């Protein structure tokens, strides 16, 4: 493992990404703890912490400029309190493929008032009953959850389920937090699917090149790694009418 130092931050790749944001690339260093980010001097719109060994999402200084945080493929099992004090403008948070287990572990995200794009895919918590409605109720500012746009009907269902004394008790009952973390506990054990063909790989690469948000780029990279092809993902069902719906539930545009 590598300690995140001011020297590492200075040496890491820094560039203007596909959506014209200034990005700091800290992926793949096996960093265990987020620290020393004051050395960035708040000069970045996006920071990529993918493919590290981070267990807790905290340790941020005040970063007013930061809008996008990519933390997929880590070991995150806890989310620190008071993230809004450090990251007041965070709009995109990608936590795909981590170790979040309990619904209550997601509660600190409610403080991030600017958060509109959130991915918690491939975390054990997504298998919990009422997972999606719970997140929609607790973090109502999120417009896109797990690359699926939040529908008006879902907001109404979440409000109905968790409102009042009975709803508050239900939320309390299902929202216990993790007390301990056992490495590997609760993680999926499914066998990997076969890889895509050369033509499929090219199709995904083209889709990545045309992506309009970092979140969409990360989703497409995940498809490439898992052998899925854009346009062949399983649909969640027929679309219902509503002011927050789009024709295709899978979000491909950050607008």
Curated annotation (Swiss-Prot):
Modified positions (Phosphoserine) in chain numbering: 178, 197, 236, 255
Annotated InterPro entries: Leu-rich_rpt, LRR_dom_sf, RU2A, U2A'_phosphoprotein32A_C
Chief place of localization: nucleus
Keywords attached to this entry: Acetylation, Isopeptide bond, Leucine-rich repeat, mRNA processing, mRNA splicing, Nucleus, Phosphoprotein, Repeat, Ribonucleoprotein, RNA-binding, Spliceosome, Ubl conjugation
SUPFAM superfamilies given in the database record: L domain-like (SSF52058)
A GO term from the CC aspect: U2-type precatalytic spliceosome
Glycyl lysine isopeptide (Lys-Gly) (interchain with G-Cter in SUMO2) crosslink location in chain: 172, 221
Biased composition (Acidic residues): 240-255
GO MF term (any one): U2 snRNA binding
Pfam families tied to this protein: LRR_9
Superkingdom as given in the UniProt entry: Eukaryota
Protein's GO biological process: mRNA splicing, via spliceosome; spermatogenesis
UniProt-annotated location(s): Nucleus
Occurrences of domain LRRCT (ranges): 123-161
Modified residues (N6-acetyllysine): 172
Start and stop residues of the LRR repeats: 20-41, 43-64, 65-86, 89-110
Statement: the UniProt record of this protein carries the keyword Phosphoprotein: yes
Residue segments, region Disordered: 179-199, 222-255
Tagged with keyword Ubl conjugation: yes
Known function: Involved in pre-mRNA splicing as component of the spliceosome. Associated with sn-RNP U2, where it contributes to the binding of stem loop IV of U2 snRNA.
Subunit record text: Identified in the spliceosome B complex. Identified in the spliceosome C complex. Found in a pre-mRNA splicing complex with SFRS4, SFRS5, SNRNP70, SNRPA1, SRRM1 and SRRM2. Found in a pre-mRNA exonic splicing enhancer (ESE) complex with SNRNP70, SNRPA1, SRRM1 and TRA2B. Contributes to the binding of stem loop IV of U2 snRNA with SNRPB2.
Family, as annotated: Belongs to the U2 small nuclear ribonucleoprotein A family.
Name of this chain's protein: U2 small nuclear ribonucleoprotein A'
Originating species: Mus musculus (Mouse)
Gene: Snrpa1
